[in-house]
Amino acid sequence: MKIRKLLTLPLIPIYRNVGFFVFMYILGAVCALSTLPDTRGATLYENLWLELFVDDYAACLVLSLLPRRLRGIGRAVAYTVLYATALADVYCFGKFGSTLNPSMLMLVGETDSREAGEFLRSYLTPEVLRGPVGNVVCVLALHVAWSLRRRIFRKLSYRRRMLALGRIQRLRARMAAVEPVAGIIVAAVVVWAAVASAGNKAGCHRLMSASSVGEVEHLLTAKDHGVMYMPIYRLAFSIRSNQLAARQIEQLIGASTKARVDSCSYTSPHIVLIIGESFGRHHSSQYGYAVKTTPRQSALERSGLLTKYTDVVSPWNLTSFCFKNIFSMHVIGQEGDWCDYPLFPELFRQAGYHVTFITNQFLPRAKEAVYDFSGGFFLNNPILSSRMFDSRNATVHRYDDGLLDDYRQLKDQEGARSLTIFHLLGQHVAYKQRYPAARKKIWVSTYDTLRPELDLRERRMLADYDNATLYNDSIVDRIVRLYKDSDAVVIYMPDHGEECYEGTRGFICRNHSAAIDYDLARYEFEIPFWIYTSPKYRRRHPELTARIRAARNRRLMTDALPHMLLHLAGISAPDYHAEYDILSDSYDEMRPRLLKATTDYDKLKPAK
């Protein structure tokens, strides 16, 4: 008898919460299936069924330890939270193409009561039940029917109640006979599921215990990162990410309040910064690449108006980290963190420049990955945005040429002194989507002799990347032409490099390994960088033009870019440091260029 009781012990949490166990498992499965993207190759989380089982069982175990009265209250609270979160999650997926994420939560926090009312009236219509929301509502309806089973039973006729009781008693007798075996099976599955889920649970714990949004993003680049596979986990992760972002926002606002401009000579009336995306200089024909991917930039260089810099690296190979380091007056190696220092557009605005930010990525959107959230949260914060920018575009575009239309709409606001920042989508994956099909000029056959070791699929991918680079060349050239008759200086740099079957490395995009070797640094951190000076600018500022040309072979890491920009504007401020300004006579060219704040780029050597 004691052995039987011991063997059936694993069944107690389920017996005491049978409705909870069954319907929460169904709810988890329905949510996973309802939020599976309708794209080729999309798959469910590989450990879904086992991890859902052990999570469900663990919740039942906790509930079973509560006194009966508290157990009922606990289940009611859990049902309310889990169903509400599930409905919100699948609704967001059906309406916006994304499950709950940090950006959605941030948008909710910035929504006032009027906007919330308009949203509810516009989007909460009966039609939503036809989508994924309807699946969750069906589970909820079945659960309600289950909860009302005793009331329904009492409404049956006496004969039907007796027949039902007989069947129930026979079923219970059969179940009692197999309880020991069922207990063993449940215990075995729980152990199996716990072991199989341990890695993901550890990964999720690392995400939830990260100390900054940047750390969260970096953890997500690891192959074994935690998967928040349930709506309630995604909600918790979104709340945590927003808490971390809010902490850095407070620091940035504090730094902004202390920012000061002592004087400004307005040396360069119009300064343009073009920030590209995922462009390593080894795919630029301007830097020696065999395929003609940058003919227009090369032509500008031959004209003498464009000065190409030869030794420039990015501080990170992640867009969000690059943006934080590029926008902050902080440089890697200085005391404190990036968010402890002012952002350079704030200083330009204080100095009297009209600052415009035109981006094809960092606008507040519901369907936004953590990477965009991490890079854009400080740019989209209402307080910081108002302190940095006078004008911004309101929409993103499929292709970067849409930004030129945005500029034309905002141009009249510029005034006599302007800083305009273009942020392109550039060569961001997926490469084939970065350029119109009609602009395809580079074909797979191009690589028959250049890269014969690549298979057909790889050569297609490479052609797409190089076509995206060629299209990017046309966009950059068109931006430069907007300023050819102005007293303007234009700086171009991508955020970081990109790999596309480089050498024998055999992969695309970037490798986010903590260890940085020579090849990784070469392909993912070395970037093109140049400065264009218009004919009018060259006539009016010969000394500064000469400085720009004289600095072209100096070492540079782009975290120091703001100090050069302040030099171009003639802004004097406590946060400006000449030793970080590549145009200054006091520039410290031997400052360690620490990639990811850890690896000295200039000490890396090729593998033998």
PLM features per residue range, with description:
Residues 60, 405-408, 446-492, 531, ...:
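A long, amphipathic alpha-helix that forms part
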Residues 335-342, 459-471, 514-527, 538-565, ...:
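A short beta-strand-to-alpha-helix junction
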